[in-house]
Regions:
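Polysaccharide-binding and catalytic clefts of secreted carbohydrate-active enzymes
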Residues: 1-5, 139-142
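Substrate-binding surface in catalytic domains of secreted glycosidases
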Residues: 3-117
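Short, acidic/polar
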Residues: 33-40, 147-161
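Generic serine detector
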Residues: 35, 86, 127-128, 134, ...
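Glycan-binding loop/region signatures in secreted carbohydrate-active enzymes
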Residues: 91-155
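Acidic/aromatic/glycine-rich contiguous surface patches that form carbohydrate-binding/processing clefts
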Residues: 155-174
Length: 174
C-alpha cells in the first residue's frame, strides 16, 4: 500500500490499459482502498475511480460500523482530487464474538433475523447511521453492527452533501 515504486508501476500499467481500452471501445474502472496514497500519485484521466468507503471496523478491530460520517468525509477529502470518482458502499456488517476482535461477516437480513431470534431491538448509531445490538446465547456475548437500506441512504446523502452534486454509488454486498 505504501510502496510508491509499485504504485508508479501500476500507474504506467493503467495508462497502457486506458489506451488499449479506448481502442477497443471499453471503459476502465479502478477500485481503490481508502489507504491509497492519492496525495503522492498522479492518476490519469480516463478511468472511473471507485473508492471503497467501508471496513472502518471489521475482523481484528473492536466492534463498530463499516463506515461512519466522519470516515466518509475523510475519504471524500482525500480522494476528491481524482477525476471521475464514485464511491463503493457495503451493506451488511459483522458479528463480533466474546473477545471483541474476532468478527464474522453477516448480511443485513441475517443480522435482522439474529436480533429477532435473540429478542432484541437494534439501535441506530447517530455517528454512522448503522444499526447495532448485543445479545447473549449460552455463554457467549456477541455484538452485531450492520448497514441496512436506511444506512446506505444516509451514507449516500452524506457523500452527496460533501460533493455538492449527485454521487455515483457502487454497492458491495455479501
Amino acid at each position: 500500500r505504501k510502496d510508491l515504486d509499485l504504485w508508479q508501476a501500476f500507474l504506467k500499467f493503467e495508462e497502457k490499459l486506458l489506451l488499449l481500452a479506448e481502442d477497443a471501445g471499453l471503459k476502465v474502472r479502478i477500485v481503490l482502498e481508502p489507504s491509497t496514497p492519492v496525495e503522492q500519485l498522479d492518476f490519469p484521466a480516463g478511468a472511473e475511480y471507485v473508492v471503497m468507503c467501508y471496513n472502518l471496523y471489521g475482523n481484528g478491530t473492536m466492534p463498530g460500523p463499516k463506515a461512519d460520517f466522519a470516515f466518509l468525509q475523510q475519504v471524500y477529502e482525500k480522494f476528491r482530487v481524482l477525476p471521475n470518482i464514485s464511491y463503493a458502499l457495503a451493506n451488511g456488517g459483522y458479528i463480533w464474538e466474546n473477545d471483541g476482535t474476532t468478527a464474522t461477516q453477516c448480511r443485513a437480513a441475517e443480522a435482522k433475523a439474529l436480533a429477532e431470534k435473540a429478542g432484541v431491538t437494534p439501535e441506530r448509531d447517530e455517528s454512522s447511521g448503522a444499526l447495532y445490538f448485543s445479545y447473549t446465547e449460552g455463554r457467549k456475548n456477541d455484538t452485531v453492527w450492520y448497514a441496512d437500506e436506511q444506512t446506505l441512504a444516509q451514507w449516500t446523502r452524506c457523500l452527496g452533501e460533501l460533493t455538492g452534486e449527485k454521487v455515483f454509488i457502487s454497492l458491495w454486498r455479501l
